[in-house]
């Protein structure tokens, strides 16, 4: 193993821990170091707490750090990975579909809201232009019609869950650990949808560095799948003590090796975005995606 000062440095801007778990495990277990890389986070999860619903999209922590060059990579939902590269000034690529396969679930404590059709004209709190937003539109537009899908802008998932628990909103979309926490607290699921994310990377990373990084991340996935609850505390830490690691359900997140973002999947996502005014549609797969 090369000394740290001789290894290429890869800085990761943090997303939610449920999405970052393979990176966390890869660092913790020394997998990146053994692959010849010096991988670390460019900020803490506490730093992410400063993001708010009012903050412009490209001023959010991970986007801002990547765009200014303080981070070499971050993950975000599939649709947002396209959006952020189109909005950003730095340039970059989508190198893979991320290892985390997670659900967004629409939760409520309101007995009047039981199935997706009950959400016609009912605001669902999401974080704008993130997985919670895109999947909520997808879950509801076939049930109630696009004109009856109502989106309420909220902040990070813990903020949305607090709003739900305080009855400041009737329905929210969240991922783990807030799905498990919501069920523990007596909320119910109205709808849920699994989705992948995109790994946004700097154009400065070489193909060899990318391969070493994702090979190590895939090893981390294997370790997570072999002993999920050894690492579950990293996810439940997001709930600030309200959920024990063993209370985290296995049903709403799993992990697999990263995949190439092929043109068919890209075009389906991109066409969906264009049809809803979520992209001007000026990009091509070959311009945004590397493999």
Report the location of each language-model feature.
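Structured segments of extracytoplasmic/periplasmic soluble domains
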Residues: 29, 65, 84, 122, ...
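Periplasmic-binding protein-like
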Residues: 13, 18-21, 98-109, 183-217, ...
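Short linear loop/turn motifs
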Residues: 38-50, 248-257, 283-291
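C-terminal segment of N-terminal export signals and the immediately downstream linker at the start
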Residues: 2-4, 208
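Solvent-exposed, acidic/flexible segments
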Residues: 12, 16, 59, 99, ...
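Short, glycine-/small- and polar/acidic-enriched structural segments
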Residues: 4-144, 151, 170, 190-192
């Amino acid at each position: 193993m090369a000394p740290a000062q001789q290894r290429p440095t890869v800085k990761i801007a943090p997303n939610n821990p449920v999405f970052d778990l393979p990176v966390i495990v890869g660092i913790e277990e020394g997998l990146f170091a053994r692959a010849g890389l010096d991988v670390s986070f460019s900020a803490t999860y506490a730093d992410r707490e400063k993001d708010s619903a009012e903050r412009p999209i490209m001023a959010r922590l991970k986007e801002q750090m990547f765009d200014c060059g303080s981070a070499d990579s971050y993950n975000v939902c599939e649709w947002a990975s396209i959006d952020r590269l189109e909005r950003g000034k730095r340039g970059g690529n989508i190198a893979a579909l991320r290892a985390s396969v997670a659900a967004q679930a629409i939760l409520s404590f309101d007995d009047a809201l039981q199935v997706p059709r009950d959400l016609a004209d009912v605001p669902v709190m999401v974080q704008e232009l993130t997985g919670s937003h895109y999947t909520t539109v997808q879950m509801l537009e076939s049930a109630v019609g696009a004109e009856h899908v109502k989106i309420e802008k909220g902040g990070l998932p813990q903020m949305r869950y607090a709003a739900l628990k305080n009855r400041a909103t009737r329905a929210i979309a969240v991922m783990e650990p807030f799905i498990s926490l919501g069920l523990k607290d007596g909320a119910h699921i109205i709808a849920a949808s699994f989705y992948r994310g995109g790994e946004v990377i700097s154009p400065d990373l070489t193909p060899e560095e990318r391969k070493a990084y994702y090979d190590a991340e895939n090893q981390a996935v294997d370790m997570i799948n072999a002993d999920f609850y050894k690492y579950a505390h990293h996810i439940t830490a997001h709930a600030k003590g309200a959920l024990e690691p063993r209370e985290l359900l296995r049903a709403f997140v799993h992990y697999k090796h990263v995949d190439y973002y092929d043109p068919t999947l890209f075009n389906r996502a991109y066409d969906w975005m264009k049809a809803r005014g979520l992209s001007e549609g000026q990009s091509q797969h070959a311009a945004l995606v590397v493999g």
